[in-house]
Amino acid sequence: LAQARAAAAAGEVPVGAVIVKDGQVIASGRNRPIGSHDPTAHAEIVAMRAAALVLGNYRLDGCELFVTLEPCAMCSGAMLHARLNRVVFGAADPKTGAAGSVLNLFDNANLNHQTKVEGGVQSGACSVVLQDFFRNKRNEQDQQKRALHPLRDDALRTPDAQFAGLPDYPWEPRYVSDLPALDGLRMHYLDEGPADAGRVYLCLH
């Protein structure tokens, strides 16, 4: 989690990883693709590269990798190639997760090496770090849009606090003001919520 927070502070998607051997952390990594201009620099890859240098071997026999987010297909393939004994992840990734969410590369008996995988460990804490990061990013983008597309003097300016009383509404409001059809007005909308939500609120003004 500390590595994930460090990634967020650097403007990267907050994912962190550590590699453990014989009960000791031998390497760590955080997301670095933006800063390093490297599409492969996911936290898991960074950590595995560091561990391989420590051990003097790309095969990480006897090692376990802990990561805050379910690994993608690229990272999962590298983990299998590195002969990791076990992979433990926190939050599931319903969009690119390759350890059970979208596909499961670890559940293929035809592969020449099998790596155990366990998910959901401290998933709540891991999810919060991600949610906070993307919420802040959306807020920054909304503020930039508002600055580029100021509201008309007669536009309604309902404070965000007015929506705080809606049941099951812990998410940040989102806005659109750059559509030509709005003509200087602002549309407020909600496009996220729990999968099992009993009601859907559409807020337009």
Residue ranges and their predicted role:
Residues 58-62, 195-197:
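Short helix-loop-beta connector
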Residues 65-85:
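Local cysteine-cluster metal-coordination motifs and their immediate loop/turn environment
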Residues 143-201:
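Alpha/beta-hydrolase fold catalytic core
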